[in-house]
Amino acid sequence: MSKAEIEKEPLNLSQLDLFEEIEKLKKELNAVVLAHYYQEPDIQDVADVLGDSLQLAREAQKTDAEVIVFAGVHFMAETAKILNPNKQVLLPDLEAGCSLADSCPPNLFRHFKAQHPDAIVISYINCSAEIKALSDIICTSSNAMHLVEQIPKEQKIIFAPDKNLGGYLMKKIGREMILWQGSCHVHEIFSEKKLIGLKVRYPGAEVLAHPECESVVLRHADFIGSTKAMLDYSVASDKKEFIVVTESGLIHEMQKRSPKKLFVPAPSTQETCACNECPHMRLNTLEKLYLCMKNRTPEITMSEDLRLAALKPIERMLELSK
């Protein structure tokens, strides 16, 4: 069945029906649903594993399921396929890309890398399989600092593709790196002025921010960390109010873990409140999740040569971050 035919397929299923059908398909296919914190709440609730990029990569590596359904964006599903060549990996919507991954075209990065032949390449996991294949080590926002700190000080490092995460690491660790100038549109659009206004409105609130944000925003944060780190911090903190400076999907799990606490999404520079939602992540819906499992498509595929080349830096990451 083609993508167009699948999209036209009539669905007369309620939300509850979809939940039930997805659970049935999990058993029939021996499938596991992995979902990122930035997915819509319904998908988060039906997922077998909910996590950030590092958690989901680890789960993809160890799962016994025959089919991996990845509710996230394309590079995440690619990573699952790289780690599981003999398993079917499904993505609810193949158009669910990533502005950060798109900001680092392989042909341009290959030329950039050639200009610094004595540097090793550490690439943020938010990149294509082709960029992973050009890298020495992959990192996530959870383990980036730990991995960079393990590299000898005299060794030059190219850090790609996120300039904001790279700049944050340089400041925290105190070493220079050669940065590729890529960025995430969602994390770059948060408004410093509006954030200051929220801090005035909620004077007792702690500001939790993702390191993909710009430095002018990060300087107002009480805590900076990965999505999982922000979630864990909000659970452990004695504070009752938080301003959350990342994709607003994370707030769903924060609220579930701490129902008596208040979580306020940070505002963007745009007037619409939807700007702190990743448009790529939100292409996946509960209906598309059901249909991709029912029809076992769209499926992630790649050449074995590319998979093996991209596997090495991912395995290096998993080895160094144990």
Curated annotation (Swiss-Prot):
Annotated localization: Cytoplasm
Name assigned to this protein: Quinolinate synthase
Molecular function in Gene Ontology: 4 iron, 4 sulfur cluster binding; metal ion binding; quinolinate synthetase A activity
Record: residues binding iminosuccinate: 36, 53, 124-126, 141, 210-212, 227
Binding-site residues, [4Fe-4S] cluster: 98, 184, 278
Matches recorded under PANTHER family: QUINOLINATE SYNTHASE, CHLOROPLASTIC, QUINOLINATE SYNTHETASE A
Pfam families: NadA
GO BP annotations listed: 'de novo' NAD biosynthetic process from L-aspartate
